[in-house]
Structure formats: structure tokens, C-alpha cells
Amino acid sequence: MDAITPESAAACYEAMLSTAAVEITMIGPSAGEAITGIFREAFRKALESRSRQPIDPDFDMEQKIPAEVRRVTEEMDLTQGKMVMGFSLLPAEDKKAQAVSRIATAIYGSSPFSKLFMNVREKLSLCYYCASRTMASYGYMLVDCGIESANQEKAEAEILHQLDEVCAGNFTETEMENARLAVVNSLRTVTDSLSAMSSWLLNEILQGGDSADPTDEIELTQAVTAEEVRDYMRSAKLSVVYLLAGPGKGE
């Protein structure tokens, strides 16, 4: 950030106008063709003086495994610390792999019955909150937690232990069924919100998908097996640990 200058920021902005791919989603009863024409004309007028060469999204589906874990600590005048652990994962190349990722994430850390919530948060009280989220197509997972800085090492160790538990297949059929129910319900409620539906459609565009209806994913979700969850999570490799701590507490 310190290296950014007004000139470099302006150059980046100019490059964005010339190369950025623009995707617009429209949800509602209006005629799509009429809306498309309005936006096309507006962008034509705004950018007609530029030589546009939009860059298509190009996802590298190779998993990035770091040579060593990067650790970053910053200090602020605060009481509650924050830790984020970043993991490299095998990118999900198709809808089936994405369904496996959703179930695995629900079991590990994105639900009220997850390993992280039930153990790191509830049983051991190492965090104020602890949850995971996965960007399956990009091949990464984040575990985000609020902690007392003094508990950082214990919390990190337990988060990794719970990952090991999932990788070993140490979860029950009840946990699998709860995960299926949670993910299916989440898919069904996407269409309840225009913003959620817009995000879904944009994600489909970026990933090269063609599913306009989130409920199309339900059958794949219900078919996910415990073995698939175990094998998927075994690809997780810790890449970075970020700690935001109070003054003198990050040492």
C-alpha cells in the first residue's frame, strides 16, 4: 500500500477501463432485451474513445501448495483479537465437486453443528466465534475467528485438529444429514433475495456455468458421500495465518 502513488493508481484505473470484463445481471419482470439495450448504449458512450480488450476470466485449476506457512501479525488498540487461517484446496472443477465442497464446509465450519463451532467455540471456549468459508472454484478456504490473543496458539492447534478429524472421516451420518439439510435449505432460499440471486448468477458467469436455478444443485448435494467429503478435505494445506492483536499481545 505504501508504494501506491497517484500516478500508479490512475494508471491502474485506466487499465481497468480498457481490460475489465463487465457483467450485468437483471432480475425482475422487465423485458431483458430493453434493459440490455440501455446498458449497451450507456457503456458505448462512456468507453467509445478507448480501445477495449476485455480479459476473459481464466481460472488456473492447479492447486497452489506453499513451500511454507506465511505468518503475519499486526497490532491495534483493541481487546478482542482476530485470526484468519488460509488454506489451499484442490479447486472444484465441476458441479459435483462444488456440491462436495458445500457439504464438507458445513461439516467443518460453516454451520451451527460444525466441528469448529461445537468444539473450538462451544466445548473449549477458545474463540468468540469460529467459522470457515470456501471458494471452491478458486481453491481456497478461510477459517475466521475472534480470539483472546493469548489463546492464539491453542485455537490454531484445535482448528487444525478438527480439520484432521474431518480428513480422517471422524464424523457421523447424522452430521452428514444435517449438512445436506443445511445446504439444500440454503440453495432453496437463494431465490428469496434479489441480491442473493444476482450473486448466484454472477458466480455462474465467472465459473462458466449455466445454472440459472440454484435448486438444480439439490440432487447433487443430496448424493454427496462421507468418503467424498473426507477425500476433498484431505487436499487442504495451511498457507497463511493472519493475527490482529492488541498492543504487545501478538508476540
For each of these PLM feature ranges, what is it?
Residues 119:
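Ligand/cofactor pocket segment of small-molecule handling proteins
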Residues 52-115, 244-245:
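His/Glu-based metal-binding/catalytic segments typifying zinc-dependent metallopeptidases
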Residues 1-55, 91, 122-251:
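Charge-rich, well-structured scaffold segments of protease-associated domains
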